[in-house]
Amino acid sequence: SSDLVSKNQIVWGANHFISRMPYDSACWLLFDKKVSEEVSFAQYEMAWTSLNGTCKKFDYRWSGMLQENMKNKEVRIHETQKPIALYDWIFSKYATEGMKILDTHLGSGSSRISAQKNKLNFVGFEIDKDHFNNQNKRYENFVSQLTLF
């Protein structure tokens, strides 16, 4: 169809609005934050995909002060921020170098940083100016670290 902007889609949080997804999918992504069921927030995050295949799970401790990679701990700048490692995992499975990536809910910019690391062409949108500025500062800091070496 000529009105499509992408060949495939990955939509985080789609379990909250599944009736609005265009069709059923067998290939969901599950982000297991490796936290206790006693926490007040979700233990897992789910993404609907348009991809062919089976459900896949990414395990990575992501709980406020506790993170999988404490040596390279990420500063939290967004309420629904996901770890860069999650996007590294997604891109390693579903993208190839030079592929175009569109993120319509840029948030903290983790997807943007991962796209840069994985040599992907990236376009991102964020409606909230403060969130956009915060992720842009985070991204510029990441890129400046690359030029040091």
Residue ranges of predicted features:
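Class I S-adenosyl-L-methionine
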Residues: 3-149
